[in-house]
UniProtKB/Swiss-Prot annotation:
It is an enzyme of class 3 (hydrolase). This is Glucosamine-6-phosphate deaminase. One of its GO terms (molecular function) is identical protein binding. One of its GO terms (cellular component) is cytoplasm. SUPFAM superfamilies: NagB/RpiA/CoA transferase-like (SSF100950).
Amino acid sequence: MQIIRVANAEEGGKKAFELIKEGMNNGAKVLGLATGSTPETLYKEMTASDVDFTEMTSVNLDEYVGLGGEDEQSYRYFMNKHLFDKKPFKETFVPNGKAEDLDAASAEYEKIIDAHPVDIQILGIGQNGHIGFNEPGTPLDSLTHVVELTESTINANKRYFDKVEDVPTRAVSMGIGSIMKGKKMILMAYGEAKAEAIKGMIDGPVTTDMPASALQNHQDVVVIIDDAAASKL
């Protein structure tokens, strides 16, 4: 793992975008994208730039079960608002959280991943070490699947909803094995709340108790963190 220390999330977004541009110059065509507050500074850099993404494909990590693209809390809505409406891509894929058969939709999404191999995967990390919505206990070879969200994840995401009861309890997520198929990983984390997870990911054993620790077995991982997130290393 390559660890890059930055002063703040704004600098982290700039650094991540530099790595994406470098990858695109070297032929990258597919970006794996994430949602939440962590990648927002990256998407600001992307939308403010003159870089053309119309030949790029994106594959998103996850989506809440029960929310469609018109729902403001859905991850499809988030991606459209923060990136795709401002910077068109050739194709954009987000899991279908409203599918009648979620298992079939998950298997179909895995086929999409295999048909569009991810060149650069953007990741955040949960306070419990989750990547995507792969909670502790998820098999490290897991593929796209339906996830029961933990109480800590629901509480971490309640700030996006009017009340905690409105937070979906399930999601469709790329599995850890799905994520590991990507050629290059860029994981960003900011703030003291992420320090324990960063320590476990980098210094701890590879274990299902810390899903992000699987990245120790990947050949090309860049970790972009501020001093607070790095404080327990």
